Amino acid sequence: MEKTKETETDNKTLIYHSCYGTDAKVSLDIQMYYSNGNICIELNDEDYKEPYGCLTVNLCDATPNYCSYVDVNNMPEAEDFIVENKLGVFTGLVKESGFVRYPLYMFDAERLRDLCPDGMIVYEKGKGIQAVQKQKEEKR
């Protein structure tokens, strides 16, 4: 039987393929950067129950809702991870900081709600987006 690369192990656990040849089972922890309200997405290692890395980076500029710069400096596979797991799309915009060009991604709110519902409630409430969530619940 041929072994295929898994990208998702259950509803809330994803596989992060490292450039070092290892795979980690990770879950998302969604928060908000205090200085500008941008979405912050951290990865937690499910096997070791500790932080794995931060998918996003705070470059001080406020971005549109659900958008954040991706930390390709410390997590070079971050863009592949986002695409493989259908977490968001590249906006075409980048910001330079030092010698690094950080891509701006718009994250899929529905997908993030599925993977980290509590974090998204806090993020959306902090951004004043809770009306969208209420409208969705009313349709059910």
Task: Enumerate the language-model features and the residues they cover.
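Solvent-exposed, flexible loop/coil segments flanking beta-strands in beta-rich domains
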Residues: M1-Y16
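Catalytic phosphate/metal-binding cores of nucleic-acid and nucleotide-processing enzymes, i.e., regions
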Residues: E8, Y20-D23, S27-L43, Y48-C54
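Generic structural motif
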Residues: Q31-Y33, E46, C60-A62, A109-L112
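Acidic, aromatic-enriched beta-alpha/helix-loop junctions
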Residues: N38, E42-L87, T91
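Short beta-strand element of the conserved SAM-dependent methyltransferase core
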Residues: L43, L104-F107, A131
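Short, compact, well-ordered microdomains
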Residues: V72-E124
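Short linear proline/tyrosine/threonine-rich motifs used for host-factor recruitment
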Residues: V122, I129-A131
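Non-Sec secretion/translocation targeting segments of pathogen effectors
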Residues: K134-R140
